[in-house]
Amino acid sequence: MFTLLVDFADKISVFNVFRYITFRTGGALITSALIVFIFGPTIINSLRLRQGKGQPIRADGPQTHFKKAGTPTMGGLMILSGIIGSSLLWANLSSIYVWVVLLVTLGFGSIGFYDDYLKVTKQSHLGFSGKARLGLEFIIAGIAAWVIMHNGQAPFSSSLTFPFAKEFIINLGWFFIPFSCFVIVGAGNAVNLTDGLDGLAIVPIMIAAASFGVIAYLSGNAVFAEYLQIHFVPGTGELAVVLGAVIGAGLGFLWFNAPPAAIFMGDTGSLAMGGLIGTVAVATKHEIVLVIVGGLFVVEILSVIIQVGYFKMTGKRVFLMAPIHHHFEKLGWTESQVVIRFWIIAVILALVGLSTLKLR
């Protein structure tokens, strides 16, 4: 639609607004939200009929979770429909970065869908083989990293910059590809582990999307990039449109995921969203900033790594339960307290992350 409407700009001046990324980002946000609002109830009813018992609830989880039994999962299908449909309408599809991000999103979403399918059919929280799942994720991430490195649309830089230290730069060289794989796969699984309470993951996802929407817009603009002394990556500005679609789809999904949730995001959505944000961070050359903006996700995945590692070494646990949001539930926090307090942390971390654009 972007190309069609811009063609009219030479004849009808009002169509010039479609040249502006900011306008199209707003359009993508509204469109994706409407897609989820309109088709959401149909998708939820269909999934409820097909899944029967819905997503299985962990037997060792907090007692308050057992009342959620029967809630359908795979709500990520709603989110992906909104993002992809809206992005194809509003984004400039001549940007290779748009295609890379959307394909990673679809790839990770497909892996998550199969994982959800196995969990529902087997009625077990153990789905897809961990090794096979990670292997597929690394293959998809590796292809994305290779395309970003050899896309030919702009001079490529393999340098890694650090917030608050503009003079400290590491040239990754060919290590850029394995490093990017680590970022993308790590982001996907970090968001996946965060998705354990109603509304817990989707709001921080939208916050991260908004933050990286700003970063993508600035990175794709030569004037702003030079002023802020950040990497100028032509074409990444269009990722702001995709991220606008993420926010819109997230708002639509939250309408149905607000407690008591009518549907869960599932791995279909959480893996896809994490992979999307991780790929944007790699494309815009802000991988380290992702650690700050997505700090909540980082803490969640670290809590699992620490819990598993320490238990294997000592037979004891560091946390009452991992990921860490369940630890706080076990301490007596209500679900709403955990969710809202984690949202607040996500907002603070996003503001800190954005501040690094100027404080260099």
Swiss-Prot record:
InterPro entries per the UniProt record, alphabetical: Glycosyl_transferase_4, PNAcMuramoyl-5peptid_Trfase, PNAcMuramoyl-5peptid_Trfase_CS
PROSITE patterns assigned: MRAY_1 (PS01347), MRAY_2 (PS01348)
Primary location group: membrane
Pfam families: Glycos_transf_4, MraY_sig1
Pathway(s) served: Cell wall biogenesis; peptidoglycan biosynthesis
Membrane-topology descriptor: Multi-pass membrane protein
Cofactor: Mg(2+)
Coiled-coil segments on the chain, per record: none
GO cellular component, as recorded: plasma membrane
Keyword Transport set for record: no
Subcellular location: Cell inner membrane
TM spans (from-to): 27-47, 71-91, 93-113, 134-154, 168-188, 199-219, 239-259, 262-282, 288-308, 337-357
Keyword Transmembrane helix: yes
Reactions mediated catalytically: UDP-N-acetyl-alpha-D-muramoyl-L-alanyl-gamma-D-glutamyl-meso-2,6-diaminopimeloyl-D-alanyl-D-alanine + di-trans,octa-cis-undecaprenyl phosphate = di-trans,octa-cis-undecaprenyl diphospho-N-acetyl-alpha-D-muramoyl-L-alanyl-D-glutamyl-meso-2,6-diaminopimeloyl-D-alanyl-D-alanine + UMP
Record-stated family: Belongs to the glycosyltransferase 4 family. MraY subfamily.
Function as written in the Swiss-Prot or TrEMBL entry: Catalyzes the initial step of the lipid cycle reactions in the biosynthesis of the cell wall peptidoglycan: transfers peptidoglycan precursor phospho-MurNAc-pentapeptide from UDP-MurNAc-pentapeptide onto the lipid carrier undecaprenyl phosphate, yielding undecaprenyl-pyrophosphoryl-MurNAc-pentapeptide, known as lipid I.
Name recorded for this polypeptide: Phospho-N-acetylmuramoyl-pentapeptide-transferase
